[in-house]
Amino acid sequence: MAKKVVGIVKVRIPGGEATPAPPLGPALGQKQIQIAAFVKDFNAKTSKMKGQLLNTYITVYEDKTYTFVTKGTSTSTLIKKKLGIEKGSGEPNKTKVATINQKQLEEIAQEKMAYMSANDIEAAKKIVAGTARAMGIKVE
């Protein structure tokens, strides 16, 4: 019989660098998960992705065990890294902070493809382009 899920915790944690400090510690503490054990497991599994901010989904079961899945770096983080900018625009419809071309969109889409609901690279590029526009980045 399957274990009963009592909660799912969604956090963004740097790969290989998880610590019991906020936001992770309080989020897991509320679900009564052994924080030190999770940190050790997470850092071991994500050591090759050191420093990348990973979207992580932690499923907590009734017997206080857990499983976790990492979904890669957020699209906005990849766009900022690719364009070398600190942050998006505060007024995306009025102020453009950078320009992204089709080649850059495709590179980001290739990297995110495994975590997206897109069926092909063109659909993934459209998703990435939408994120870029929402950040105040002009899409060429």
UniProtKB/Swiss-Prot annotation:
<keyword id="KW-0687">Ribonucleoprotein</keyword>
<comment type="subunit">
    <text>Part of the ribosomal stalk of the 50S ribosomal subunit. Interacts with L10 and the large rRNA to form the base of the stalk. L10 forms an elongated spine to which L12 dimers bind in a sequential fashion forming a multimeric L10(L12)X complex.</text>
</comment>
<dbReference type="InterPro" id="IPR020784">
    <property type="entry name" value="Ribosomal_uL11_N"/>
</dbReference>
<dbReference type="InterPro" id="IPR006519">
    <property type="entry name" value="Ribosomal_uL11_bac-typ"/>
</dbReference>
<keyword id="KW-0694">RNA-binding</keyword>
<dbReference type="Pfam" id="PF03946">
    <property type="entry name" value="Ribosomal_L11_N"/>
</dbReference>
<dbReference type="InterPro" id="IPR036769">
    <property type="entry name" value="Ribosomal_uL11_C_sf"/>
</dbReference>
<dbReference type="InterPro" id="IPR036796">
    <property type="entry name" value="Ribosomal_uL11_N_sf"/>
</dbReference>
<dbReference type="InterPro" id="IPR020783">
    <property type="entry name" value="Ribosomal_uL11_C"/>
</dbReference>
<comment type="function">
    <text>Forms part of the ribosomal stalk which helps the ribosome interact with GTP-bound translation factors.</text>
</comment>
<keyword id="KW-0699">rRNA-binding</keyword>
<dbReference type="InterPro" id="IPR000911">
    <property type="entry name" value="Ribosomal_uL11"/>
</dbReference>
<dbReference type="GO" id="GO:0022625">
    <property type="term" value="C:cytosolic large ribosomal subunit"/>
</dbReference>
<keyword id="KW-0689">Ribosomal protein</keyword>
<dbReference type="GO" id="GO:0006412">
    <property type="term" value="P:translation"/>
</dbReference>
<comment type="similarity">
    <text>Belongs to the universal ribosomal protein uL11 family.</text>
</comment>
<dbReference type="Pfam" id="PF00298">
    <property type="entry name" value="Ribosomal_L11"/>
</dbReference>
<dbReference type="GO" id="GO:0003735">
    <property type="term" value="F:structural constituent of ribosome"/>
</dbReference>
<keyword id="KW-0488">Methylation</keyword>
<dbReference type="GO" id="GO:0070180">
    <property type="term" value="F:large ribosomal subunit rRNA binding"/>
</dbReference>
<protein>
    <recommendedName>
        <fullName>Large ribosomal subunit protein uL11</fullName>
    </recommendedName>
</protein>
